[in-house]
Every structure is written in C-alpha cells, then in structure tokens.
C-alpha cells in the first residue's frame, strides 16, 4: 500500500469518526425538530425558568427558534 493511500485512509477514517460522533448530537435534532420539541416540552414540564436562571443573566430562549 502506498504511503499516500494509507494517509488518505487514516484521514478519511478520522473524518468519518468525527461525523459519526456529531450526527446524533447535532444533525439528528436539526432534521427532527418536532420530535425534539415534544421531548423537551416533556423534560421541562414543571420547571419555572425564573427559579433556575442565575440572577443577572439573560433568560434562555427557545433553542429551536430561528433568528
């Protein structure tokens, strides 16, 4: 196996590993917004935002909202 091919395979494997790690963290929630909105509504039910927000910080907004 040539040295360039081996380097390309190692680099490609590394990039694939990073992509596989980021898929469930970043890309899957972006593709399934409604599912994650429902899940977050269930997870955050009963939490009063003002009670958990540290004083002096901006109140957290909807992470799925677009600017």
UniProtKB/Swiss-Prot annotation:
What GO CC terms are in its UniProt record?
A: extracellular region; mitochondrial inner membrane; mitochondrion
Q: Mind listing the UniProt keywords for this protein, alphabetically?
A: Amidation, Membrane, Mitochondrion, Mitochondrion inner membrane, Secreted, Transmembrane, Transmembrane helix
Question: Quick check: keyword Nucleotidyltransferase in the entry?
Answer: no
Name the GO terms of the biological process aspect.
mitochondrial cytochrome c oxidase assembly
Residues in compartment: Mitochondrial matrix: 1-6
Q: In which tissues is it expressed?
A: Expressed in the ovary, specifically in granulosa cells of follicles that have passed the primary stage and in oocytes (at protein level).
Has keyword Secreted? yes
The record places the following residue ranges in the Mitochondrial intermembrane compartment, namely: 28-67
What are the TM regions of this chain, as residue ranges? 7-27
InterPro entries reported in the protein's UniProt record: SMIM20 (IPR027917)
Q: What domain of life?
A: Eukaryota
State one Pfam family annotation. Answer: DUF4538
- PTM Phenylalanine amide: at which residues? 64
Subunit info here reads:
Component of the MITRAC (mitochondrial translation regulation assembly intermediate of cytochrome c oxidase complex) complex, the core components of this complex being COA3/MITRAC12 and COX14. Interacts with COA3/MITRAC12 and COX4I1. Directly interacts with newly synthesized MT-CO1/COX1.
**Full protein name:** Small integral membrane protein 20
Biological source species: Homo sapiens (Human)
